[in-house]
Amino acid sequence: MRQLCLSSALLFLLVILVDSTPLNIHHIQDEGVETSHRRGPEKRSVIDVVTSIIDGVATGTKIVKNGAGLLTGLAEIITKAIKGQVMISRIQFDNHTQEELPTLNIEYSTLSEENKGVETSHRKGPEKRSVIDVVTSIIDGVATGTKIVTKGASILTGLAEIINKAIRGQVMISRIQFNNHTLEEFPKLNIEYSTLSEDNTGVETSRRRGPEKRSVIDVVTSIIDGVATGTKIVKKGTSILTGLAEIINKAIKGQVMISGIQFNNHTLEEYQTLKIEYSALNEENKAASKPALCLEPKVTGGCNAVMTRYFYNAQNGLCEQFVYDGCEGNGNNFEKLEDCMKTCSQEAGSL
């Protein structure tokens, strides 16, 4: 059950990202996920990959018979993709093994074949609605600016439950009655939806200047924009998105201060630890999102020439001068300081 909740939460956040914040994504420098093709390595953005999955599989997924498991399977595939364990849309992640490829390809094809739309039932007769359209309408109408006070932390939990019911066709939302919904459930669910709507007044936060309110989506978007966009998944980098998910969960529960926002049920004792945790993710993300050559060690060579060159020191984030003797070496070798900074660290200074 916990795994299902996490999968649902992941899909929930991804839909927010894809459908609610496209303009915030494109202007950010996006180094991407390093992948492996027959033509050689390439980089793909985490967001691009996830978007392609959602566009190709989730949009209009038909939820009938065993179809309720489709989005669960999709969430699992996305999780595998984030961990670099799956090939999707001809993209093979760098730590993916050939042995897994056929199975995952079949799994993806099965999901694609069942992508026929959500069958719903209206007074005017049956119609089909996209899962994303339905979920987006819920998020737009309820989640944006959900107020997290007293028992308000359960609002997003309740929202997730409603989304799960909608996916399984057990709830009527925004005048859409799903095909296996019963009239007996209608009034109760309508009240549940109204209760959530009434609490939609923003996240109450506490700053030095006094309390303020911030939208849940604004907070989550700022985290995703700052950490997840284009995160390169190498070595320990896979833990970045896991840590990000944990931070988002803490934020939803009001247990974390992020981007200058302190939630109202956050304690001062937790503040410093969580701030360090967020900073560590940002630093790890900076290193992980650089071209591979920037992470290569300094190599002076083995000949007798004397040339002034520059390399990027991943330990301190600076472009540093060194003496190169003219042979051997690697890609982390620049003739000009400007080239080093432009390639590896636009914010770096020099020594």
From Swiss-Prot:
One MF annotation (Gene Ontology) recorded for this entry: serine-type endopeptidase inhibitor activity
Signal peptide annotation: 1-20
Localization: Secreted
Sequence repeat placement: 32-116, 117-201, 202-286
InterPro entries: Kunitz_BPTI, Kunitz_BPTI_sf, Prtase_inh_Kunz-CS, TFPI/VKTCI-like
Any one Pfam family match given in the protein's UniProt record, by short name: Kunitz_BPTI
Keyword Glycoprotein: yes
Disulfide cross-links: 294-344, 303-327, 319-340
Main location: secreted
Domain of life: Eukaryota
Claim: Repeat is one of the keywords in the record: yes
Carbohydrate attachment residues: 265
Site (Reactive bond homolog) residue list: 304-305
Region 3 X 84 AA approximate tandem repeats: start-end pairs: 32-286
GO cellular component, one term: extracellular space
Domain BPTI/Kunitz inhibitor intervals: 294-344
Task of the protein: May play a role in mediating maternal-conceptus interactions in the immediate preimplantation period. Does not seem to have proteinase inhibitory activity.
The protein, known as: Trophoblast Kunitz domain protein 1
Organism placement in taxonomy: Eukaryota, Metazoa, Chordata, Craniata, Vertebrata
Gene: TKDP1
